[in-house]
Amino acid sequence: MSSGDSNLKRRRGGNTGQSSKSYNTWTDYEEDLEESGEFNQSIKKTTNTSSATLTSSEEKGSLLDYSKRCILKQDNKSRPIWVCPDGHIFLETFSAIYKQASDFLVAIAEPVCRPQNIHEYQLTPYSLYAAVSVGLETNDIITVLGRLSKLALPKEVEQFVRQCTQSYGKVKLVLQKNKYFVESAYPEVLEFLLKDSSIATARIKPTLEESVVDPKTGFIINKEVVTGAQISGGLQANQSLDPVLKNDALSNLLEEEEEDTVNNSDQHFHSFEIDPQQVEEVKKRCIQLDYPVLEEYDFRNDTVNPNLNIDLKPTTMIRPYQEKSLSKMFGNGRARSGIIVLPCGAGKSLSGITAACTVKKSILVLCTSAVSVEQWKYQFKLWSNIEERQISKFTSDNKEKISNVAGVTITTYTMVAFGGRRSAESLKIMNEITNREWGLVLLDEVHVVPAAMFRKVLTVTKAHCKLGLTATLLREDEKIQDLNFLIGPKLYEANWLDLQKAGFLANVSCSEVWCPMTAEFYKEYLINDSQGKKKLLYTMNPNKFRACEYLIRFHEQRGDKIIVFSDNVYALQKYAKGLGRYFIYGPTSGHERMSILSKFQHDPTVRTIFISKVGDTSIDIPEATVIIQVSSHYGSRRQEAQRLGRILRPKPKSDGLYNAFFYSLVSKDTQEMYYSTKRQQFLIDQGYSFKVISELPGIDQEVNLKYSSKQDQLDLLAQVLGEGEDSGKNEILEEDFDDITRGAKKSKSSAPTVSRTTGGSTRALSGGNDMNYMEYQAPAIYKSIPTQHALFKQRAKNKQ
């Protein structure tokens, strides 16, 4: 084990044993270095006490002064990035080499915020792990960072990159001819791993059939001839370094004497075979030894599993960013497991289908709901030449026989992970799924399932390659990092604004419309203690209703197609029936849904439909150009992005600046304003801006708007106050994403459940439940009641 390797093993306190230490952020790493006394002293000597030692206010997030620690290069104006000692990187989007620099940073760092002019990235161990997984070498990362940076590359950053990349990506788990091999170009790494008793026990001694065995180590030696995998659709996958290192557009910055590429075409790989039953244990031990394995599939040389006759249709066109994402997946003639992050409406499904057409083996698609299963089947038939008989669905309502040879099976996470008793028909299909050797598993919305569900799904299915697809790779319980090893590293993440500028996404105007509460409604809002009734009052605010009707009239006159979203079923029905429009929610039958959507798409007289949260992810209506949101799921950032995605698909160019419109109607001076601000955060980080409309121009002159008179408003208030507590609750579906994260427990009642109350704290109301995907209950500290002021204690006592 090298000295660099040993730096990752820290002795703590008086403990005599060593424990593996991983870092979630660069700050954690730096703090650990300082504690251990290994921080680079030469760097500290170049700064005075005030700049080297952060004050308490700086540690809490105040501005940091690096002026005395960082020296600008003379030609800094021609270089696009700022590399800070804390691992943050800032990119100027107006640079002449922005595109190449952006591609490089996406490969090595995590995007934090990407507005119009300056992008922020953060170096993390996992982002660097992903970088080496697609072929980048340690020295290449450091060299290119140094050349692109306006500042001399901080020594702390260089040391961090070396620490994180020296072991990542050097060990691969390959499935060849139905045998598992641990493979590496570094025999000393394999020797180190075999010193572990668990890995040594799992090893299978090689045979001298077609392999060359090193007599000293006993490793199998293969001479790799790298040709690259031909991706369906004509793309040749890159097999070594990221193209940014070889791009001529980097001009003089990257055209120096040092070579930027490494020729791997004549490289020898060493490997040893392991017992298939002990693969999970080997992966676990490799992670603990700081050598996480990459999983790659030599699909072209797989003669054991039958080929699937599937190709993209000649009319199917792959976009450049989809090609780029797939080039990260296919290299060295193999398919590597990982995650692709693309915006809503940018063609995640087509990327997955293209991967399936490239591998040409049995495909398993895992979705979040039965509606998504139908969508995936439609997408396979739309983009590929696969035959109907080769596609099978496995849901609670459709249990179709799986093809005896190769085929595509589409099911849900809950169907595969279900641990209870099954029907004979379901059990037979499930046995086929667990016993088959799948070439590729596509995991749709890969971020929504908790770690326990992931491990079970991935344990019961045997797959050569796994590809996760998502638009919002968000988790706040740190479980998102587990995906690096359960699925694989993040292979690619697209920039929303760049795709919008290129015409691949609609140019959306995002607005927050403030709707003042009427005096009568606001009075009831203030004096009512029921959270459900408060929510119903600000949702049914007459001024919000009038704003919604006004916007519908305005955009219908323009010829737009409008979707109005409401999580609250009572409000959904009240709005839709009051305005004479079709509506869809949980209990709406499948036939009626398809009928309404068909009319919306093809009937010019049907320009507006109302939809509950069933439409967040399960509809595909390219014709929609306007979203109006009257009720939402508290502070869910994910839902905001998903709803925006309903209108992100490319639109015909319009005379104005925007060709799509997103309105969020918010009752002024209520909790809804706080939730709205929280919901927008993810989209703001992607570069979108929300303008506030405090008053819709012309709304007071619009005639015949409902609830314009005082008497109509009082009648509506009486109806709202007369409703029960359940009317103020949001619709929560049996197949809701959040149900999946909570275990998807179904109600035993035979009656259809369209809404229910969920227990929790104020963190849940602010969107915490959407973002905290946890396997366990939150610590008691989060549920404790804070100390109350004496005034409020007395008030509570008086109420009793």
From Swiss-Prot:
Keywords: ATP-binding, DNA damage, DNA repair, DNA-binding, Helicase, Hydrolase, Isomerase, Nucleotide-binding, Nucleus, Transcription, Transcription regulation. Residues 329-491 form the Helicase ATP-binding domain. Its main location: nucleus. ATP binds at L342, P343, C344, G345, A346, G347, K348, S349. Coiled coil: none annotated. GO terms for biological process: DNA damage response; nucleotide-excision repair; transcription by RNA polymerase II; transcription initiation at RNA polymerase II promoter; UV protection. It catalyses: Couples ATP hydrolysis with the unwinding of duplex DNA by translocating in the 3'-5' direction; ATP + H2O = ADP + phosphate + H(+). It is found in: Nucleus. A motif (DEVH box) lies at residues 444-447. Residues 1-27, 743-769 are annotated as: Disordered. GO terms for cellular component: nucleotide-excision repair factor 3 complex; transcription factor TFIIH holo complex; transcription preinitiation complex. The keyword Transferase does not apply. Residues 546-704 form the Helicase C-terminal domain. Induction: Up-regulated in a dose dependent manner following exposure to both UV light and cisplatin. Unaffected by exposure to hydrogen peroxide. Component of the 7-subunit TFIIH core complex composed of XPB/repB, XPD/repD, gtf2h1, gtf2h2, gtf2h3, gtf2h4 and gtf2h5, which is active in NER. The core complex associates with the 3-subunit CDK-activating kinase (CAK) module composed of cycH/cyclin H, cdk7 and mnat1 to form the 10-subunit holoenzyme (holo-TFIIH) active in transcription. Belongs to the helicase family. RAD25/XPB subfamily. This is General transcription and DNA repair factor IIH helicase/translocase subunit XPB. The lineage of its organism: Eukaryota, Amoebozoa, Evosea, Eumycetozoa, Dictyostelia.
